[in-house]
Design a protein with these regions (language model features):
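Well-ordered alpha-helical scaffold segments within catalytic/enzyme domains
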Residues: 2-13, 51-63, 107-124, 169-187, ...
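Extended glycan-interaction surfaces of carbohydrate-active proteins
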Residues: 2-44, 68-105, 134-162, 196-264, ...
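A generic, well-ordered mixed alpha/beta core segment in the N-terminal half of proteins
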Residues: 88, 103-138
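Loop-centered beta-sheet repeat module
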Residues: 160-204
Length: 354
């Protein structure tokens, strides 16, 4: 699979306007009255996937619902700037869910900046900037000397060992969005700029600093999706394991070599391909997900093609959200393109050493 050139724009018709509205309405039906967006009715909410779904609502024009989701985050932020790993209706889903994952806590910065780009709502930006600031300060307590982020604080307050490449790439994206918000607020954050430079360098140049999760497709494409790897390096990264993870006509494996393609990973790869200047390939991947679309506009999580079986039998808001965001980028949504192209996001300062 050649990746040596930028492609012409993607063909139209990724999702129709009616299909987009139907999917957004389906996410809205799962959203609770307090603004929280769980995976599906009766299941837990986690902060990262909650933000993914909120961004999808904004991309579909459901700005009031998206704002309610961000207000939920503001109300549930812990005093130290963190959020718990998972929530039931009235608090952490289990005692173990009192852990805090660094990429979960960083990601609201991406959503808040996306919502401001989508709406221009200055009151919202002013209200949410302190929330983002507290979250970033929490996350950066876990940055290691090599630039990578420790992935989790356990419920007893100790830092879990190890760093995750996908999580660090996601947090690098979030840190750049947080810097953009700081610029809008007129509050320079030089420490964040240094942290962003070190974190991006670790993701690009030091895979040995991360736990080996190379079986998972997210570790393959996420540095491109997050904007940490761009240009020829992005094309080379995507080409290197394309045949391991992409199943022609079906989508993207979640885990290699399992015969299981998943909607979330497929849509995220499509978004990464668009960001890398490969919209036709992105469109081809996104169109594979038609088999996972349900009558109400939601998407099944995955398909085991060896058994011709939908599995698991769940329809998650974050899968639907990823599809809407990929479609929004392909069809020209300004906020989504700005956030995921990364072209105008602050880059941080390069580290003094490697």
């Amino acid at each position: 699979m050649a990746f040596g050139h930028r492609e012409r724009p993607a063909p139209a018709g990724v999702l129709t306007a009616a299909e987009t509205a139907e999917t957004a309405a389906a996410i809205g039906r799962v959203q609770r009255t307090d603004g929280g967006i769980p995976w599906f009715r009766g299941h837990h909410l986690d902060p990262w996937d909650h933000v993914e779904a909120a961004m999808a609502l904004d991309a579909a024009g459901e700005h009031d619902r998206a704002e309610a989701a961000y207000d939920w985050l503001a109300r549930h932020q812990n005093d130290d700037g963190s959020w718990y790993a998972a929530y039931a209706d009235d608090g952490p889903a289990t005692p173990a869910d009192r852990a805090a994952e660094t990429n979960f806590c960083a990601y609201p910065a991406v959503g808040v900046y996306h919502h401001w780009l989508a709406t221009g709502d200055e009151a919202f930006r002013r209200r949410m900037t302190p929330v983002v600031t507290a979250a970033v300060e929490f996350v950066l307590r876990f940055q290691r000397p090599g630039g990578e982020l420790g992935w989790r604080r356990d419920p007893d307050g100790t830092a879990a060992p190890g760093a995750l490449l996908t999580g660090s790439a996601s947090a690098h994206h979030a840190l750049r969005c947080a810097l953009a918000l700081a610029e809008l607020a007129g509050t320079p954050q030089p420490d964040w700029e240094l942290a962003a430079g070190r974190l991006g360098h670790a993701v690009r140049a030091h895979p040995e600093r991360f736990l080996d999760k190379s079986r998972y497709s997210m570790d393959w494409y996420y540095p491109v999706l997050a904007g940490t790897v761009r240009g020829a390096a992005a094309h080379a990264r995507l080409a290197a394991r394309w045949d391991d993870f992409v199943v022609p006509g079906l989508g993207v494996r979640c885990v290699h070599p399992n015969p299981w393609v998943t909607g979330g990973e497929s849509a995220e790869l499509a978004l990464a391909l668009w960001a890398a200047g490969l919209p036709r390939r992105a469109t081809e991947i996104l169109r594979c997900l038609a088999r996972l679309r349900t009558d109400d506009g939601m998407y099944w999580t995955g398909y085991v093609y060896a058994d011709d079986a939908i599995w698991p039998e769940e329809r998650t808001t974050w899968t639907a959200g990823a599809v809407l965001l990929a479609a929004a980028a392909l069809t020209g949504d300004h906020a989504t393109r700005t956030v995921f192209s990364g072209a105008t996001l602050p880059t941080g300062l390069p580290p003094d050493c490697c």
